[in-house]
């Protein structure tokens, strides 16, 4: 169930999927951001612009939480990190749903991100059982 990176470090499938989600959130945000950066007709910025940064920050937090959970020896110590991972994936998923209502061609890529989060959750379930 482990993969190896090019520099011979063990990378678990859940770690790899978290990195994939992070990369995907950056790409989607870069694609959506120019559409949201324009001022609206009322002169105000689109409030959804902040969700693009939020999904990047949240997905960036997944890997450190995974690493910390894997480093802990006792299940009680791991629990905090496991809960954090669950919260992060839920918030990323919710922010994807919010961004799907925006006026941008980039929103077409958000279902892909949501599918990746669903795959991550399945991996997470198996991974949690193996810790």
At which residue positions do the language-model features occur?
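Amphipathic alpha-helical assembly/interaction segments
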Residues: 1-131
């Amino acid at each position: 169930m482990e993969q190896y990176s090019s520099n011979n470090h063990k990378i678990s499938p859940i770690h790899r999927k978290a990195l994939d989600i992070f990369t995907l959130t950056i790409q989607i945000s870069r694609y959506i951001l120019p559409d949201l950066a324009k001022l609206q007709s009322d002169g105000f910025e689109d409030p959804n612009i902040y969700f693009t940064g939020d999904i990047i920050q949240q997905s960036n937090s997944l890997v450190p939480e995974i690493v910390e959970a894997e480093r802990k020896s006792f299940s009680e110590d791991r629990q905090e990190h496991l809960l954090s991972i669950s919260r992060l994936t839920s918030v990323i998923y919710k922010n994807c749903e919010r961004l799907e209502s925006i006026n941008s061609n980039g929103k077409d890529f958000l279902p892909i991100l949501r599918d990746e989060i669903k795959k991550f959750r399945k991996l997470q379930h198996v991974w949690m059982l193996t810790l």
